Amino acid sequence: MEIELSVIIPAYNIEPHILQRCVDSMQFISELMPYEIWIVDDGSREDYIAQWVEGLQQAHIHAIRQSNMGPGGARNTGIEHAQGRYLTFVDADDYLLYGTYYTILKHLLEKQPDILCHGSMVRYEGPAVKFMMERDICPSCCSYIIRRETLGTLRFTPHIYHEDEQFCTLLHLRRAHLLTVPENGYFYRYRPESITHNPELIHKRFLDFLTVLQNLQQTPIAPTYRPALERRLDIMAMCYLVTLMRDTNGRKQTLDSLRSLRTINLYPLPRKWHGIRYFLLRIATIHPWLVVCITPLAKQLILIHNSEDRSRSFIAHIDKWK
């Protein structure tokens, strides 16, 4: 029987009970279609995942161990081994929500799109590049179910942060039919340990973000697709500035990062209309000294906003189980 869906799970130093919850949350998929799971152990300190999978005695669950290449490299390994007609990605400490993800898979079977994006703010069905030309795309690969033929040779860049954003942008530049649905059947686990004050890691995040922007700028694409890519780059530059104000370690790092963004012509933010948030941020950050001045206030506002978002997400999740 042909495998309809391959679920790829990159795993790194994950606790067994958390991985168990992730895998258990997928059991319902068999009610709709044949599926498989590929767990890629990305060089964890303890080599237990292969033995754990063997103990499950489930023929559709597979494990691979490799040297550490980051989430992107682990997903690439999963792609190479996957046999499904469609592929999707789930992080090992997250899990699927039965009711809503069941509905998402029914959309997939009914419409048979090249790409399905769930948890979208708007409903859309049409060319993926047209969607990116008009709207903000979801930058998380875990929100997509992708036809293998559509993916083609597209892969993640290993060993970097922000690999999702590069991958999802390039995905929308493929000649593909996109379906977006409002249902969100994916539960993202809030990871307080991932918020680090390590200056070296923060510096690497900014460097990797710039690398992603440069990689996308240098992508050879048809002239008709260029406006969609440029819009996406503008939005990503806006996100870079917000991240800079949230995580920067001082005036020097702020100014150095702005200079780097200026060298690729994305600072100041290009003078275009991408909505009120983009417009206001462009005005507020048009000069480097303005960015330095507003950063302390921006840090507090972003922390408050993120805290409120986490509270709403938690309450919504509890409501689903009432």
Question: Locations of the language-model features?
Answer:
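Membrane-interface aromatic/basic loop that binds lipid-linked glycans or pyrophosphate carriers
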Residues: E2, T248-K322
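Cell-envelope/extracellular polymer assembly enzymes that use nucleotide-activated donors
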Residues: E4-S6, S25, E36, Q166
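Short, well-formed alpha-helical segments that are part of the catalytic scaffolds
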Residues: I14-F28
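A conserved acidic beta->alpha catalytic loop
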Residues: S25, W38-Q51, D91
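Glycine-rich, basic loop-to-helix element that forms the pyrophosphate-binding segment
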Residues: Q66-A82
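Short aromatic/hydrophobic "clamp" motif used to bind/position activated sugar donors
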Residues: L87
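Conserved donor NDP-sugar-binding/catalytic core segment of glycosyltransferases
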Residues: G99-V129
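Conserved nucleotide-sugar donor-binding catalytic segment
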Residues: K130-K204
